[in-house]
Amino acid sequence: MNSQQCVIIAIAGASASGKSLIAKTIFDELRRDLGTDQIGVINEDAYYRDQSHLSMDERVLTNYDHPKALDHQLLCTHLQLLKSGEAVDIPCYSYTEHTRTAETLTMTPKKVIILEGILLLTDPKLRALMDASVFMDTPLDICFLRRLTRDVAERGRTMESVISQYKKTVRPMFLQFIEPSKQYADIIVPRGGKNRIATDILKTRIQHLLAK
Protein backbone atom coordinates (compact mmCIF):
# COMPACT_ATOMS: atom_id res chain seq x y z
CA MET A 1 0.00 0.00 0.00
CA ASN A 2 1.32 3.45 -0.90
CA SER A 3 2.36 5.42 2.20
CA GLN A 4 0.35 8.41 1.00
CA GLN A 5 -2.88 6.45 0.59
CA CYS A 6 -5.41 5.60 3.24
CA VAL A 7 -8.50 3.44 3.56
CA ILE A 8 -11.66 5.44 4.28
CA ILE A 9 -14.58 3.65 5.91
CA ALA A 10 -17.95 5.35 6.47
CA ILE A 11 -20.46 4.35 9.13
CA ALA A 12 -23.87 5.98 8.61
CA GLY A 13 -27.36 5.60 10.02
CA ALA A 14 -29.85 7.32 12.28
CA SER A 15 -28.79 9.31 15.31
CA ALA A 16 -28.05 6.92 18.22
CA SER A 17 -28.14 3.85 15.96
CA GLY A 18 -24.81 2.49 17.23
CA LYS A 19 -22.39 4.23 14.84
CA SER A 20 -20.03 5.44 17.56
CA LEU A 21 -19.94 2.05 19.27
CA ILE A 22 -18.98 0.09 16.17
CA ALA A 23 -16.47 2.80 15.18
CA LYS A 24 -14.84 2.64 18.62
CA THR A 25 -14.75 -1.16 18.56
CA ILE A 26 -12.99 -1.22 15.19
CA PHE A 27 -10.63 1.58 16.24
CA ASP A 28 -9.64 -0.17 19.47
CA GLU A 29 -9.09 -3.54 17.81
CA LEU A 30 -7.22 -2.33 14.71
CA ARG A 31 -4.93 0.08 16.51
CA ARG A 32 -3.32 -2.88 18.26
CA ASP A 33 -2.15 -4.05 14.84
CA LEU A 34 -1.61 -0.73 13.08
CA GLY A 35 -0.54 1.53 15.94
CA THR A 36 -2.58 4.34 17.48
CA ASP A 37 -1.15 6.95 15.10
CA GLN A 38 -2.21 4.98 11.99
CA ILE A 39 -5.98 4.93 12.51
CA GLY A 40 -8.33 7.82 13.21
CA VAL A 41 -12.02 8.61 13.58
CA ILE A 42 -13.75 11.67 12.11
CA ASN A 43 -17.24 12.56 13.30
CA GLU A 44 -19.43 14.22 10.68
CA ASP A 45 -20.85 16.46 13.44
CA ALA A 46 -17.55 18.37 13.49
CA TYR A 47 -18.50 19.74 10.07
CA TYR A 48 -21.73 21.43 11.09
CA ARG A 49 -21.52 24.91 9.63
CA ASP A 50 -20.24 27.80 11.74
CA GLN A 51 -23.19 29.75 13.15
CA SER A 52 -21.35 32.28 15.29
CA HIS A 53 -22.94 35.10 13.28
CA LEU A 54 -26.42 33.98 14.38
CA SER A 55 -28.17 34.59 17.69
CA MET A 56 -28.78 31.63 19.99
CA ASP A 57 -32.49 31.77 19.17
CA GLU A 58 -31.66 31.48 15.46
CA ARG A 59 -29.18 28.65 16.01
CA VAL A 60 -31.76 26.60 17.89
CA LEU A 61 -34.07 26.80 14.87
CA THR A 62 -31.50 25.27 12.49
CA ASN A 63 -32.50 21.91 11.01
CA TYR A 64 -29.44 19.88 11.99
CA ASP A 65 -30.77 16.76 10.28
CA HIS A 66 -30.75 18.31 6.80
CA PRO A 67 -27.68 17.86 4.56
CA LYS A 68 -27.40 21.64 4.12
CA ALA A 69 -26.53 22.01 7.82
CA LEU A 70 -23.20 20.31 7.14
CA ASP A 71 -20.14 21.53 5.27
CA HIS A 72 -19.54 18.35 3.31
CA GLN A 73 -17.30 20.22 0.88
CA LEU A 74 -14.83 20.97 3.69
CA LEU A 75 -14.98 17.33 4.80
CA CYS A 76 -14.24 16.20 1.23
CA THR A 77 -11.31 18.61 1.03
CA HIS A 78 -9.90 17.34 4.33
CA LEU A 79 -10.20 13.71 3.24
CA GLN A 80 -8.45 14.46 -0.05
CA LEU A 81 -5.63 16.21 1.82
CA LEU A 82 -5.25 13.30 4.23
CA LYS A 83 -5.15 10.84 1.33
CA SER A 84 -2.40 12.92 -0.27
CA GLY A 85 -0.32 12.83 2.91
CA GLU A 86 -1.13 16.22 4.44
CA ALA A 87 -2.39 17.02 7.94
CA VAL A 88 -5.69 18.87 8.43
CA ASP A 89 -7.32 20.95 11.17
CA ILE A 90 -10.73 19.49 11.96
CA PRO A 91 -13.32 21.92 13.38
CA CYS A 92 -14.66 21.42 16.90
CA TYR A 93 -18.42 21.77 17.34
CA SER A 94 -20.25 22.70 20.55
CA TYR A 95 -23.64 21.03 21.06
CA THR A 96 -24.51 23.50 23.80
CA GLU A 97 -23.60 26.63 21.79
CA HIS A 98 -24.84 25.18 18.47
CA THR A 99 -21.80 26.40 16.57
CA ARG A 100 -18.10 25.74 16.08
CA THR A 101 -15.65 26.66 18.80
CA ALA A 102 -12.39 28.53 18.26
CA GLU A 103 -10.42 25.29 18.67
CA THR A 104 -9.51 22.79 15.99
CA LEU A 105 -8.14 19.25 16.18
CA THR A 106 -5.14 18.44 14.02
CA MET A 107 -5.23 15.06 12.29
CA THR A 108 -2.17 13.67 10.58
CA PRO A 109 -2.38 11.20 7.65
CA LYS A 110 -3.56 7.71 8.63
CA LYS A 111 -3.67 4.26 7.09
CA VAL A 112 -7.32 3.98 8.12
CA ILE A 113 -9.88 6.74 8.64
CA ILE A 114 -13.30 5.86 10.04
CA LEU A 115 -16.05 8.38 9.29
CA GLU A 116 -19.23 8.33 11.33
CA GLY A 117 -22.33 10.43 10.80
CA ILE A 118 -26.01 10.43 9.95
CA LEU A 119 -25.80 11.96 6.46
CA LEU A 120 -22.51 10.65 5.07
CA LEU A 121 -24.11 8.51 2.37
CA THR A 122 -26.34 11.31 1.04
CA ASP A 123 -23.43 13.11 -0.65
CA PRO A 124 -22.12 11.60 -3.92
CA LYS A 125 -18.78 13.43 -3.62
CA LEU A 126 -18.23 11.93 -0.19
CA ARG A 127 -19.28 8.48 -1.38
CA ALA A 128 -16.67 8.67 -4.13
CA LEU A 129 -13.94 8.95 -1.48
CA MET A 130 -15.10 5.93 0.53
CA ASP A 131 -13.49 2.52 0.22
CA ALA A 132 -16.35 0.83 2.08
CA SER A 133 -19.54 1.98 3.76
CA VAL A 134 -21.86 0.72 6.46
CA PHE A 135 -25.46 1.60 7.37
CA MET A 136 -26.62 0.93 10.92
CA ASP A 137 -30.18 -0.34 10.46
CA THR A 138 -31.41 0.06 14.03
CA PRO A 139 -35.18 0.47 14.66
CA LEU A 140 -36.10 4.14 14.90
CA ASP A 141 -37.92 3.81 18.24
CA ILE A 142 -34.80 2.37 19.85
CA CYS A 143 -32.72 5.19 18.35
CA PHE A 144 -35.12 7.76 19.78
CA LEU A 145 -34.93 6.36 23.31
CA ARG A 146 -31.13 6.26 23.15
CA ARG A 147 -30.99 9.80 21.77
CA LEU A 148 -33.31 11.11 24.47
CA THR A 149 -31.17 9.62 27.23
CA ARG A 150 -27.90 10.80 25.65
CA ASP A 151 -28.91 14.36 24.81
CA VAL A 152 -30.37 15.05 28.26
CA ALA A 153 -27.41 13.49 30.09
CA GLU A 154 -24.52 14.62 27.88
CA ARG A 155 -25.58 17.60 25.77
CA GLY A 156 -27.43 19.83 28.20
CA ARG A 157 -30.81 19.35 26.53
CA THR A 158 -34.25 19.22 28.14
CA MET A 159 -36.52 16.25 27.53
CA GLU A 160 -39.11 18.54 25.96
CA SER A 161 -36.63 20.02 23.47
CA VAL A 162 -35.37 16.58 22.41
CA ILE A 163 -38.91 15.30 21.84
CA SER A 164 -39.87 18.45 19.93
CA GLN A 165 -36.81 18.24 17.69
CA TYR A 166 -37.44 14.56 17.04
CA LYS A 167 -40.98 15.23 15.84
CA LYS A 168 -40.13 18.34 13.81
CA THR A 169 -36.88 17.36 12.09
CA VAL A 170 -35.16 14.17 13.25
CA ARG A 171 -37.82 11.67 12.16
CA PRO A 172 -38.91 13.53 8.97
CA MET A 173 -35.30 14.00 7.82
CA PHE A 174 -34.52 10.35 8.57
CA LEU A 175 -37.34 9.30 6.29
CA GLN A 176 -36.46 11.85 3.59
CA PHE A 177 -32.67 11.61 3.50
CA ILE A 178 -31.05 9.08 5.82
CA GLU A 179 -33.08 5.92 5.24
CA PRO A 180 -33.00 6.30 1.42
CA SER A 181 -29.19 6.60 1.58
CA LYS A 182 -29.08 2.99 2.84
CA GLN A 183 -29.08 1.88 -0.80
CA TYR A 184 -25.50 3.13 -1.14
CA ALA A 185 -24.11 1.10 1.77
CA ASP A 186 -21.88 -1.91 1.14
CA ILE A 187 -22.89 -3.49 4.45
CA ILE A 188 -26.21 -3.08 6.28
CA VAL A 189 -25.93 -3.82 9.99
CA PRO A 190 -29.00 -4.84 12.03
CA ARG A 191 -29.14 -4.99 15.84
CA GLY A 192 -26.91 -1.95 16.48
CA GLY A 193 -23.25 -1.52 17.33
CA LYS A 194 -22.93 -4.77 19.30
CA ASN A 195 -23.33 -6.90 16.16
CA ARG A 196 -20.09 -8.87 16.42
CA ILE A 197 -20.36 -10.62 13.06
CA ALA A 198 -20.80 -7.32 11.22
CA THR A 199 -17.83 -5.85 13.08
CA ASP A 200 -15.63 -8.80 12.09
CA ILE A 201 -16.74 -8.56 8.44
CA LEU A 202 -15.86 -4.87 8.35
CA LYS A 203 -12.48 -5.46 9.99
CA THR A 204 -11.71 -8.18 7.44
CA ARG A 205 -12.62 -5.81 4.61
CA ILE A 206 -10.32 -3.11 6.01
CA GLN A 207 -7.45 -5.58 6.37
CA HIS A 208 -8.02 -6.74 2.78
CA LEU A 209 -7.88 -3.16 1.50
CA LEU A 210 -4.69 -2.48 3.48
CA ALA A 211 -3.05 -5.56 1.97
CA LYS A 212 -3.53 -4.33 -1.61
UniProtKB/Swiss-Prot annotation:
UniProt-recorded Gene Ontology molecular function terms: ATP binding; cytidine kinase activity; uridine kinase activity
Pfam families: PRK
Pathway recorded for this protein: Pyrimidine metabolism; CTP biosynthesis via salvage pathway; CTP from cytidine: step 1/3; Pyrimidine metabolism; UMP biosynthesis via salvage pathway; UMP from uridine: step 1/1
Residues binding ATP, per UniProt: 13-20
Database matches in SUPFAM superfamilies: P-loop containing nucleoside triphosphate hydrolases
Cross-referenced InterPro entries: P-loop_NTPase (IPR027417), PRK/URK (IPR006083), Uridine_kinase (IPR026008), Uridine_kinase-like (IPR000764)
Cellular component terms per the entry's GO annotation: cytoplasm
Signal peptide: none
CDD domains in UniProt: UMPK (cd02023)
Reaction(s) this enzyme catalyzes, per UniProt: uridine + ATP = UMP + ADP + H(+); cytidine + ATP = CMP + ADP + H(+)
EC number: 2.7.1.48
UniProt KW Transferase keyword: yes
Subcellular compartments: Cytoplasm
Organism domain of life: Bacteria
GO-annotated biological processes: CTP salvage; UMP salvage
EC category name: transferase
Keywords: ATP-binding, Cytoplasm, Kinase, Nucleotide-binding, Transferase
Cystine bridges: none
Family: Belongs to the uridine kinase family.
Alphabetized PANTHER family for the sequence: URIDINE KINASE
Protein name according to UniProt: Uridine kinase
Organism whose genome encodes this protein: Shewanella baltica (strain OS155 / ATCC BAA-1091)
